[in-house]
């Protein structure tokens, strides 16, 4: 009797487990099919010439939430089926739907970044960007997310710096500039651009990265580095070349170098804060190097000028 009871209990347990498994399978497959319908609704047609309409448009908040929830449900269903080694025809459907969804989110991410304006409803944009980034990263598409951010924001940063008058500085270019009568005008342009670049352009980019990738510190630092490092290093090329070329020139560039030194020195705390992470610390190191070189050059020029004035005074005496 005891044996019979044990056998019945075991069979009942097995039957219950099997029923539960079938129920879970069915639920996951339903989730995949429901997600597919919603995702296909927003599939990007590469051959279409119609105007792009964002899911995250102000009138589409319900659609955006529904889309992101569908992607999350799809990801959970895929994880369940793969972890339980389920050979389901819905796996291929899920994978295809996920690729379509990620392509859509890449486009949305790119478009919102292009339209991003720090002074106009930027908190809404940042919230949407963060939702997209977190969804893409959690679904295993971090590389694609980082790539879109880099391409879009680096272009925006470079354009902003160019608009301020920052050039791609070369030795030959600076040499001509120093010997030209309007050197002071070029320096004024750089000084103004430098202030805005540090206080506004790079500061706002740091703000954007910190909030969009708040849950992923490594990605946050990488994206800020990708978008700003090249432009920031080029920014400090100007004073660096001024010092190098001025070694052979007369000392009337003293006040130019003093202005450059004071400007960088004033922004030193902000520079140290913005470019503190190891991945972009080369910018901070270049700023320190510029200050050191400018300081040495100013002292040398001051001594030279003092000697010239003393010599001139002795001659007239």
Describe each model-derived feature in a short phrase.
Residues 1-193, 197-200:
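Long amphipathic alpha-helical scaffold regions
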